[in-house]
């Protein structure tokens, strides 16, 4: 087992050296679960926030699913080419928003929902399995032969799930991603989003529903500058209902996905391992933030260049609250992800709706000023129940927790440059 981990670590280091991702990336999720309800359209509304987002040092904005969808939020898409039926606004408004982002040197990330798809109409048996692509021609006009044959609610599918152990999405037909026509037409659609609409990269929704080998095809053939996958699986929990100390299998799954898609390319994954551990750690168990190997316990402890860290998103937080971060400790979460290696992602709600903009701005400014990046060196100085203290790149020190008598632990030449509810950040003078 030790040799296996040593080989994996060496492999990760070598891949990290060849990584083509920009080192100073800061992502921003530009919507929440209720954004579709906004009067006048969300795209138009977000246009008025572009200056603030760019001024904060954000490099990439993740936008909601743009295609026509049965579900208002966009996650039950049907006519993929139809960008005028979205609840967030029409195609012209979307392109104007992307143009405004590009004008501030900020890239636009599309939310790609391709694991499943809703049909336009029923077949002769009364089953919804006839798909419409949203164009006058036959692109993405599919039938039951494009549905996985093991998708029981939609019989007569002839395809196979790329990996039978992958997750099933019960609310809509699971698409057969091994079908050559499916691959070809989805690649064409992705390239259309990039060249015609201006998107720069992809966020793959429910990416655990199809294999990484298939995702590699879509990434390689659409050439995004950035891609991030949602691989959301459960952590390992003990009898007390809390995460086990060792979450190596969980983060290994994230690492494996990136390896298969292409470790030297633009592919990353959301670091759900770090999210789950951090959720619990800030509740008086900060010792969890040092793994058994002395490093960060999440994906950032193994392959930070390929990890997108976050505090909450439209699923875990917002109005869904599927896995929310403790609301009174959110800034501790940002103090962690914005000073640590990895690619941090800021959530719209926290930045604009929670009154945390100034504090988050300050942390991003420190990260940028000190050149903290996805592969910055992390030294964990202390990790006790009430104190987490770490030095990053020898330039920044961050403290989490209620303990205040830490002056003797701070080296000379550092001064406090940010502080808030149970967190503080020092910067080397």
Curated annotation (Swiss-Prot):
<dbReference type="InterPro" id="IPR013775">
    <property type="entry name" value="A-amylase_pln"/>
</dbReference>
<feature type="binding site">
    <location>
        <position position="399"/>
    </location>
    <ligand>
        <name>substrate</name>
    </ligand>
</feature>
<keyword id="KW-0732">Signal</keyword>
<feature type="binding site">
    <location>
        <position position="141"/>
    </location>
    <ligand>
        <name>Ca(2+) 2</name>
    </ligand>
</feature>
<feature type="signal peptide">
    <location>
        <begin position="1"/>
        <end position="24"/>
    </location>
</feature>
<comment type="similarity">
    <text>Belongs to the glycosyl hydrolase 13 family.</text>
</comment>
<feature type="binding site">
    <location>
        <begin position="404"/>
        <end position="406"/>
    </location>
    <ligand>
        <name>substrate</name>
    </ligand>
</feature>
<feature type="binding site">
    <location>
        <position position="172"/>
    </location>
    <ligand>
        <name>Ca(2+) 3</name>
    </ligand>
</feature>
<feature type="binding site">
    <location>
        <position position="314"/>
    </location>
    <ligand>
        <name>substrate</name>
    </ligand>
</feature>
<feature type="binding site">
    <location>
        <position position="135"/>
    </location>
    <ligand>
        <name>Ca(2+) 2</name>
    </ligand>
</feature>
<keyword id="KW-0326">Glycosidase</keyword>
<feature type="binding site">
    <location>
        <position position="168"/>
    </location>
    <ligand>
        <name>Ca(2+) 3</name>
    </ligand>
</feature>
<feature type="binding site">
    <location>
        <position position="151"/>
    </location>
    <ligand>
        <name>Ca(2+) 3</name>
    </ligand>
</feature>
<protein>
    <recommendedName>
        <fullName>Alpha-amylase type B isozyme</fullName>
        <ecNumber>3.2.1.1</ecNumber>
    </recommendedName>
</protein>
<feature type="active site" description="Proton donor">
    <location>
        <position position="230"/>
    </location>
</feature>
<dbReference type="Pfam" id="PF00128">
    <property type="entry name" value="Alpha-amylase"/>
</dbReference>
<feature type="binding site">
    <location>
        <begin position="301"/>
        <end position="303"/>
    </location>
    <ligand>
        <name>substrate</name>
    </ligand>
</feature>
<feature type="binding site">
    <location>
        <position position="209"/>
    </location>
    <ligand>
        <name>Ca(2+) 1</name>
    </ligand>
</feature>
<feature type="binding site">
    <location>
        <begin position="68"/>
        <end position="70"/>
    </location>
    <ligand>
        <name>substrate</name>
    </ligand>
</feature>
<feature type="site" description="Transition state stabilizer">
    <location>
        <position position="315"/>
    </location>
</feature>
<dbReference type="GO" id="GO:0005509">
    <property type="term" value="F:calcium ion binding"/>
</dbReference>
<feature type="binding site">
    <location>
        <position position="137"/>
    </location>
    <ligand>
        <name>Ca(2+) 2</name>
    </ligand>
</feature>
<feature type="binding site">
    <location>
        <position position="174"/>
    </location>
    <ligand>
        <name>Ca(2+) 3</name>
    </ligand>
</feature>
<dbReference type="Pfam" id="PF07821">
    <property type="entry name" value="Alpha-amyl_C2"/>
</dbReference>
<dbReference type="GO" id="GO:0004556">
    <property type="term" value="F:alpha-amylase activity"/>
</dbReference>
<dbReference type="InterPro" id="IPR006046">
    <property type="entry name" value="Alpha_amylase"/>
</dbReference>
<feature type="binding site">
    <location>
        <position position="167"/>
    </location>
    <ligand>
        <name>Ca(2+) 1</name>
    </ligand>
</feature>
<comment type="subunit">
    <text>Monomer.</text>
</comment>
<feature type="binding site">
    <location>
        <begin position="203"/>
        <end position="208"/>
    </location>
    <ligand>
        <name>substrate</name>
    </ligand>
</feature>
<feature type="binding site">
    <location>
        <position position="174"/>
    </location>
    <ligand>
        <name>Ca(2+) 1</name>
    </ligand>
</feature>
<feature type="binding site">
    <location>
        <position position="234"/>
    </location>
    <ligand>
        <name>substrate</name>
    </ligand>
</feature>
<feature type="binding site">
    <location>
        <position position="295"/>
    </location>
    <ligand>
        <name>substrate</name>
    </ligand>
</feature>
<dbReference type="InterPro" id="IPR012850">
    <property type="entry name" value="A-amylase_bs_C"/>
</dbReference>
<feature type="binding site">
    <location>
        <position position="252"/>
    </location>
    <ligand>
        <name>substrate</name>
    </ligand>
</feature>
<dbReference type="GO" id="GO:0005983">
    <property type="term" value="P:starch catabolic process"/>
</dbReference>
<keyword id="KW-0119">Carbohydrate metabolism</keyword>
<feature type="binding site">
    <location>
        <begin position="75"/>
        <end position="76"/>
    </location>
    <ligand>
        <name>substrate</name>
    </ligand>
</feature>
<feature type="binding site">
    <location>
        <begin position="416"/>
        <end position="422"/>
    </location>
    <ligand>
        <name>substrate</name>
    </ligand>
</feature>
<feature type="binding site">
    <location>
        <position position="426"/>
    </location>
    <ligand>
        <name>substrate</name>
    </ligand>
</feature>
<keyword id="KW-0378">Hydrolase</keyword>
<dbReference type="InterPro" id="IPR013780">
    <property type="entry name" value="Glyco_hydro_b"/>
</dbReference>
<feature type="binding site">
    <location>
        <position position="169"/>
    </location>
    <ligand>
        <name>Ca(2+) 3</name>
    </ligand>
</feature>
